[in-house]
Amino acid sequence: LASLTDQTQLAAATAFDIVFAEPDRTGSSQLQKIYSNDEALVEILSRTIDHDDLFAQSIANHGTVVLGLAPNNKTESQNYLGKHGMVIQGDDPKLFVQPYTGMQNNLDKLEAESAGLGSMSIGNDDVIVRTLPSFENINGSLVPSLPLEIVRVAIGASTYQVKSSNASSEEAFGEN
C-alpha cells in the first residue's frame, strides 16, 4: 500500500475506501510478538521498519490522502477529529442527517498523517443506494462523506460551509 500511495504522488487526492483498523499482521511489530521466543529473528525484525509505519510515512509524504471511516451503531466512538473547519448557518444540520453512535476508525498513526477522513455509508440499512449523504452525525459530530472529503482535499479547501433551513429565511416546515 505504501508503494501504491507513492505511485499516486501526482494525483490531486488519493483515497482508500477501506478502514485500516488493525495492525498489518505481516508487519515487523506483529511478527516480533508471534515469534517472541526466537531472539535472533526478533533482533532482525526490530531493525526493520514496520509496514504500518511505512504506510503512514507514505501517506504523510503524499500529502493528499483521504481515509474512510465506517459509521455504525454498535459502538460509541470518541470524538471525531476532523481535518477541516466547519461554518454552519441556520438550524443545526445534525437534526437532518443520519445519526450513528460510533464509527470504526483507522489506526491512529494513519489517521494522523492523512489529509482527510470521510464517512463511508449509504445512509440506510437495506443496502439499496437511494441517496448518498453529504454529512452524517456520528456521536454528535458532523462528519463529511468520503466523496465530499476527497473533493475538499483535491481542491485545497480548508472549511465546509453548511447551510441548513432558516439560514436565509428558508423554512424547514417542521421537517427534520
Go through each PLM region and give its residues.
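Non-transmembrane functional regions of envelope-associated proteins
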Residues: L1-N176
